[in-house]
From Swiss-Prot:
Transmembrane segments: none
Compositional bias of kind Polar residues: 359-372
A GO CC term attached to the entry: nucleus
Segments for region (Disordered): 1-60, 163-257, 327-381
Record's subcellular location: Nucleus
Protein name per UniProt: Transcription factor SOX-8
GO MF assignments: DNA-binding transcription factor activity, RNA polymerase II-specific; RNA polymerase II cis-regulatory region sequence-specific DNA binding
Location of region: Dimerization (DIM): 67-107
Domain notes: The transactivation domains TAM and TAC (for transactivation domain in the middle and at the C-terminus, respectively) are required to contact transcriptional coactivators and basal transcriptional machinery components and thereby induce gene transactivation.
Compositional bias ranges of the Low complexity kind: 338-349
DNA-binding region(s) in UniProt: 109-177
Organism placement in taxonomy: Eukaryota, Metazoa, Chordata, Craniata, Vertebrata
């Protein structure tokens, strides 16, 4: 141990010396022939520090350094250094904990190498010398492949060496027990999001767009073609419980949609005529329970709105987009109409001629139209709940064919009667206002209302609605 300290003395300058940490090799060389400073004996300004290494690092490579130091510096410098450092007790120097593992309470014992590691270590050294440019990761991959190709005979020397190492390890550390580091558990959110992604993708790339204020769920198609527009509502991922109930409907629905989607990808809704909706899809519609969706009512008090604005006042103008029915993106889209939108009475007065009414395009229009006409000129894909309603229209009622759709659960005027008295400023999002360029879509061609459920059963005349596009 005494010998070691001698070598340390030569290798290192006293930590108390300010020059020790800062002086570089060039500094040392330039001073190498200067006379010894008297201050050196106090250990304050001893110039010839052989290396700028911190004190704690000395023990690691001391022997090598001692040999190097001997050759690098003239004898007078070496003597001066050893003279200065001789009286210093190196056991007092604090060692950095991470710098030297042996000082830890329990030094880490590595596992003995297995046969592959023996092979890889030897081969890596050899290859790294021959091909220094090889990246270590690539090297490891290649070594692994080679190892698999080796025959038993070729592997034998490595296996034997590994066995020898294991026995030796057991001797050295009789009570050794392998304790692997605990892995951090997979984040809980991760698995959830994966299952969520699965859910949303099995329905034909649906993105449930939840309108924070309006609770409307739109479809991935709308998302796709309006992706360029900065004013889309926020889209938190949702996995509503209704998904379970409507699994079978989804199958039905997406059959149709897939056919159409195989056509072209993007749709321009300004050219869409909803009257092309195929009647067979309408006839396939099934019922679902309106009250199941009450949990999705918006929190901003639309439910409490006075109901005295129109004849169907007792009912909310909820329009269930068919994403609600089938895709489980259950959204009640609350669409409040501006005074221009028709209440049944205004429709009656104009019975003789078809009306054209201008209406706001509300989020539910998005969800239905984008959902319902996800693809293109043939609307065979339109299904469960959409039924040709661009649900935001007050007159969307006319879109129900009187065929086998059973609407007992959709308390009729859910579709028909919005709040005609509400001004357009009711929209929370500025992009629902009609200030954008309008596009006219003749919506309801020959479809009439199911008389049994309609409070306004005398509307037989189809009503055309002009929608304004946000």
């Amino acid at each position: 141990m005494l010998n070691m300290t001698e070598e340390h003395d030569k290798a290192l300058e006293a930590p108390c010396s300010p020059a020790g940490t800062t002086s570089s090799m060039s500094h040392v060389d330039s001073d190498s022939d200067s006379p010894l400073s008297p201050a050196g004996s106090e250990g304050l300004g001893c110039a010839p520090a052989p290396a700028p290494r911190p004190p704690g690092a000395a023990p690691l490579g001391a022997k090598v350094d001692a040999a190097e130091v001997d050759e690098r510096f003239p004898a007078c410098i070496r003597d001066a250094v050893s003279q200065v450092l001789k009286g210093y007790d190196w056991s007092l120097v604090p060692m950095p904990v991470r710098g030297n593992g042996s000082l830890k309470a329990k030094p880490h014992v590595k596992r003995p190498m297995n046969a592959f590691m023996v092979w890889a270590q030897a081969a890596r050294r050899k290859l790294a010398d021959q091909y220094p440019h090889l990246h270590n990761a690539e090297l490891s991959k290649t070594l692994g492949k080679l190892w698999r190709l080796l025959s038993e005979n070729e592997k034998r020397p490595f296996v034997e060496e590994a066995e020898r190492l294991r026995v030796q390890h057991k001797k050295d550390h009789p009570d050794y027990k392998y304790q692997p580091r605990r892995r951090k558990s997979v984040k809980a959110g991760q698995s959830d999001s994966d299952s969520g992604a699965e859910l949303s993708h099995h329905a034909g790339t649906q993105i449930y767009k939840a309108d924070s204020g309006l609770g409307g769920m739109a479809d991935g198609h709308h998302h796709g073609e309006h992706a360029g527009q900065p004013h889309g509502p926020p889209t938190p991922p949702t996995t509503p419980k209704t998904d379970l109930h409507h699994g079978s409907k989804q199958e039905l629905k997406h059959e149709g949609r897939r056919l159409v989607e195989s056509g072209r990808q993007n749709i321009d809704f300004s050219n869409v005529d909803i009257s092309e909706l195929s009647s067979e899809v309408i006839n396939n519609m099934e019922t679902f329970d309106v009250h199941e969706f009450d949990q999705y009512l918006p929190l901003n008090g639309h439910t409490a709105m006075p109901a005295d604005h129109g004849p169907g006042a007792g009912f909310y103008s909820t329009s269930y987009s068919h994403s609600a029915a089938g895709a489980g993106g259950a959204g009640q889209v609350w669409t409040h109409k501006s005074p221009a939108s028709a209440s049944p009475s205004s429709a009656d007065s104009g019975q003789q001629r078809p009306h054209i009414k201008t209406e706001q395009l509300s989020p539910s229009h998005y969800s239905d139209q984008s959902h319902g006409s996800p693809a293109h000129s043939d609307y065979g894909s339109y299904s469960t709940q959409a039924c040709a309603t661009t649900a935001s229209t007050a007159t969307a009622a006319a879109s129900f064919s009187s065929s086998q759709c059973d609407y007992t659960d959709l308390q009729s005027s859910n579709y028909y009667n919005p709040y005609p008295g509400y001004p357009s400023s009711i929209y929370q999002y500025p992009y629902f206002h009609s200030s954008r360029r309008p596009y006219a879509t003749p919506i309801l061609n020959g479809l009439s209302i199911p008389p049994a459920h309609s409070p306004t059963a005398n509307w037989d005349q189809p009503v055309y609605t002009t929608l304004t596009r946000p």
